[in-house]
UniProtKB/Swiss-Prot annotation:
GO cellular component: cytoplasm; proteasome core complex, beta-subunit complex
Swiss-Prot/TrEMBL GO biological process terms: proteasomal protein catabolic process
Subunit composition and interactions: The 20S proteasome core is composed of 14 alpha and 14 beta subunits that assemble into four stacked heptameric rings, resulting in a barrel-shaped structure. The two inner rings, each composed of seven catalytic beta subunits, are sandwiched by two outer rings, each composed of seven alpha subunits. The catalytic chamber with the active sites is on the inside of the barrel. Has a gated structure, the ends of the cylinder being occluded by the N-termini of the alpha-subunits. Is capped at one or both ends by the proteasome regulatory ATPase, PAN.
Protein name: Proteasome subunit beta 1
Active-site feature positions: T7
Encoding gene per record: psmB1
Organism, as annotated: Pyrococcus furiosus (strain ATCC 43587 / DSM 3638 / JCM 8422 / Vc1)
UniProt record similarity statement: Belongs to the peptidase T1B family.
Enzyme Commission (EC) number: 3.4.25.1
Annotated control of activity: The formation of the proteasomal ATPase PAN-20S proteasome complex, via the docking of the C-termini of PAN into the intersubunit pockets in the alpha-rings, triggers opening of the gate for substrate entry. Interconversion between the open-gate and close-gate conformations leads to a dynamic regulation of the 20S proteasome proteolysis activity.
Length: 196
């Protein structure tokens, strides 16, 4: 029996910060295992990643990034930027391209500036204003393309991200739409909430 899993995660960058959003459903083949999984993982108090793919691979990569961020801070006396962490993660993924981590990750943060990046399992790295990962990507991207503007406020970006995840949940059977995990990161820090 072929096992299929899915999810939808999105990231949006605006002038005041970044918004990450994800559904909270975990599915395996035709079964919903839980409606309460967190798919956005804080790495520092200013950087987080979203998860699409192998849970074990993402958890291991998150632990590695947390350790690297602490080491960087102790060595240099300042936090690692989101761009630096994205490049580090890209290198880690690329070094393992022959035995890849089965993940697609959005990294978002606000250290010196708001930053969003999308990484594929082989280390391909794209910095953008908005992005999506997971099985519901085509549906989420359609909503993001229609609604994104450079002058969005952080609250407007949050509403757009929620709309994108919910649109994917209505059309992609592996994406849940009942509850959305949302993380906003601004110069003032990180805030997590769950929207029902």
């Amino acid at each position: 029996m072929e096992k299929k899993t899915g999810t939808t995660t999105v990231g949006i960058k605006v002038k005041d910060g970044v918004v990450l959003a994800a559904d909270t459903q975990a599915s395996l083949d035709h079964m919903v295992e839980t409606l309460n999984i967190k798919k956005i993982i804080p790495i520092t108090d200013r950087i987080a990643i979203t998860t699409a793919g192998s849970v074990g691979d993402v958890q291991m990569l998150a632990r590695y990034l947390e350790a690297e961020a602490r080491y960087y801070y102790f060595t240099w006396g300042r936090p690692m930027t989101t761009k630096a962490m994205a490049n580090l993660l890209s290198n880690i993924l690329n070094e393992n391209r022959w035995f890849p981590y089965l993940v697609q990750i959005i990294i978002g943060g606000y250290v010196d500036e708001p930053t969003i990046a999308n990484l594929d399992p082989f280390g391909g790295l794209i910095f953008d204003d908005y992005t999506a990962t997971g099985s519901g990507t085509p549906f989420a991207i359609a909503v993001l393309e229609e609604g994104y503007r450079e002058d969005l406020t952080i609250e407007e970006a949050k509403e757009l991200a929620i709309r994108a995840v919910r649109a994917a949940g209505r059309r992609d059977v592996y994406t849940g739409s009942k509850k959305v995990q949302v993380v906003t990161i601004t110069k003032d820090g990180m805030k997590e909430e769950f929207v029902v």
